[in-house]
Amino acid sequence: MEFNQKHLKFFFAFLSGVLAYIFFLLRYLSSPPTRLINENIVGLWLVEIFIFFLLTKNEAFKKIKTIRFNYKFLLCLLPIFLIALFLRFYNLANIPPGVHGDEGEWGLIELGVLNGKYREFFSLAQKGIYFDFSILSFATQAIFLKLFGVNILGVRASSAFAGTLSLIPFYFLAKEWLSKRGALLATLCLAVSHWTIAYSRLGISNIWTVFWELWSFLFIFKGLKENSRPYFSLAGVFMGLGLYFHHTFKVIPIILIIFFISLLAKEGKQFFKIILPLTCFLLMVLIIFLPQLIYYWQTPGSFSARIDEVSVLNRVEEYQSKYQTNSVSKILMTQFLKTVGVFFRGKDIGFFFYGYQGPLIDIVSLVLALIGLLIIFVRLMENKSSFLLIWLLSVIIFGGALTIDAPSSQRLIGLAPALFLMSGLGMEKILSFLKTEKLKNFLLLITMISIFLINYQVYFKQYIHSDAGWAQKEPATAIAEYLLSLGESYKVYMLREENPILYFHHGTIRFLAPKIQGVDVSENTRNYILAKDTHKNLVYILPPNSKFLSLLHQVYPLGQEHHFTNPYNGKAWFVGYEIRQDNYNIEN
C-alpha cells in the first residue's frame, strides 16, 4: 500500500493523540487521590480528546455536508421545540413550588465547584451512597448557576436545558426509524410529557441521562447505517461523557452490549464489517471515561456503592416478608409487574422526587405505544425493533425490578424516549390506513393537540397544586422562607426529638438560607430550653402539637407563636416560637 499524504496526516494525528494521552495519564497518576487536581489536568484531558477526534475530522465534515434538511418538517418541529422550551422554563424558580432537599444539596455542591472547594473533577462529590456523582457533572451544571445566579433557578436551569435540547437528537433518531409524521408525533410526546417535564424542572441530574443516551444512540445508528467511524466515534464521546452523570446512565452500556451480541448472532460474519467503527466507539468511551475509572480503581467500592444500596437482591429477607414469599423469582416478577404497571395505573413509589400517582404516560401516547409494541414483535428481526425491545426491557429490569422502592419514576426516566418512539410507530401504522394526505394531517393534528392538553393538565393544573411531590409534602422550603423573613439576627433551634423530618442542616434550608445560624436538637430538648440562650434573638422550630411548646411558653412567656400549615392539604406543618432579645430583661 502506498504511503500517501493522507496516511501521513493520520499517522501524526494518531501519534499526537497517543502522546497527549500518555502525558495526561502520567500527570493524573502522579497525583494521589487526596491531592487536588487543578484545571490544567482537565484542560489537557479535553485537548487530547479533541486530537483523537481529529483522526476522523475530514470524513466527519464530509458526512455533515451530505445531510439534507426537509425545511417544511423543520418548520413543524420549531413550534414543538418552542413549546418544550416554554414548558420547561416557564416560572422555573417557583414551579415545582417546593425545593427538594436534593436540589438544595446539588446547589451547594455546584456552588462549591464555583468557589474552588471541589477541584478534583474526576472524583466524587461525596463518598458513600448519596451524591456520589462525578465532580465533572456538577461542574457542567454549575455553569448554569453562574449564568442564572446562586438561587433555585440557577440549580434547575441545567435540567431544563438538557430536557429541551434532548429533543434535537430524539427527532433525528426518530427520523431514522419512523416516517416524518411518526417522528413529529414522537417528538411532541417527549416534548410535552408530564413525566419528562417534571424531571426537566428539578435541579438534579436524572434528565441528563436522556440527553446523553439519545446522542449516543443517534450516532450509533447513523454509524451502523453508513459503517462510519466518525459517527461511532461521536457516539463514544457522548457515551463516555454520559457515564460521568447520573447512575441511571449505567444501564446504557448494558443495552448496547446486549444489542451488539444480538446483532452478532443475527448477522454472523457480516457483523465483522463494523469491527473498526465499533473499535473507534470503544476507544473513545475508554479515553473519555478512563480518568474516572482510575479513581474507582483507587477507591474500591465507590463505583457500585449506590447500586449495592438500591439492589433488591441485597434485601431479600425484607422483600420476602413484604411479598409473603420465599421465592426470589416471585419477588422479581412482582417487582417487574409493578414497574410495568406504573405506565398504566400509576402508583409511582418514587414520590421523593416527582410523585404523581397517575400513569406516567398519558392515555393517548400509551395506546399508540402498545400498538407500536405489537409492531416491534412482528418486526423483531429488524435492528430498530430489537433495539427498542432491549431498551424497554433493560430499563424496566435494571431500573425497576432489581431495585428497591419500585417503581420509581426517577430511575425509569431513560425509558421515556423509547416509549414515545413506540408511540410514533403506532401513529405511523394508524395513518397508513388513511388514503388522503388531508385526513392524515387532520388526525395527526388532533392527536398531538390531545396529547399536549392531557399532559399540560396533569402537570400544571393537577400536580403542582397537590401534595404529591415530596418537596410539597415536607416543610423545608417553608421553614427556609420563614427564617429568611426573620433575618440573620435570629438563632435557630430545630427540635427534632419528636419529628426527625425537621432538621436544620437540610439541604433546602442550607441552600436557601445560608447565612442563618442554627443547630439541631435531637435529645435533651428540655435542658436546651431551660438553658435560656440570651445571646441572640431566638426561634424554635418544632412539630405541631409538640409537648415542648408549653415549656417554651413557661420559660419565654413573651415569645410569639406562629403555626404553619401545608397549603396543598391544609395539614399542620410546623410551629415557630420567636423570642426577641429585648424581651429577656422584661421576662427576668
Protein language model regions, located:
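Membrane-embedded, hydrophobic transmembrane alpha-helices
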Residues: 1-79, 234, 255, 259-262, ...
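Catalytic lumenal/periplasmic loop and adjoining terminal transmembrane helix
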Residues: 26-33, 248-249, 429, 433, ...
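Membrane-interface transmembrane helices that cradle and orient dolichyl/undecaprenyl
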Residues: 26-27, 51-56, 214-234, 242
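Transmembrane-lumen/periplasm boundary regions of multi-pass, lipid-linked membrane glycan transferases
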Residues: 95, 105-120, 125-127, 133, ...
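Transmembrane-helix motifs of polytopic, lipid-linked glycan transferases
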Residues: 157-180, 215, 219, 368-375, ...
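Multi-pass, polyprenyl lipid-linked donor-dependent membrane glycosyltransferases
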Residues: 157-165, 184-215, 229, 245, ...
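Transmembrane-helix signature of polytopic, membrane-embedded enzymes
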Residues: 170-192, 382-390, 441-445
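Hydrophobic/aromatic-rich transmembrane helices and adjacent perimembrane loops
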Residues: 199-200, 206-209, 251, 363-368, ...
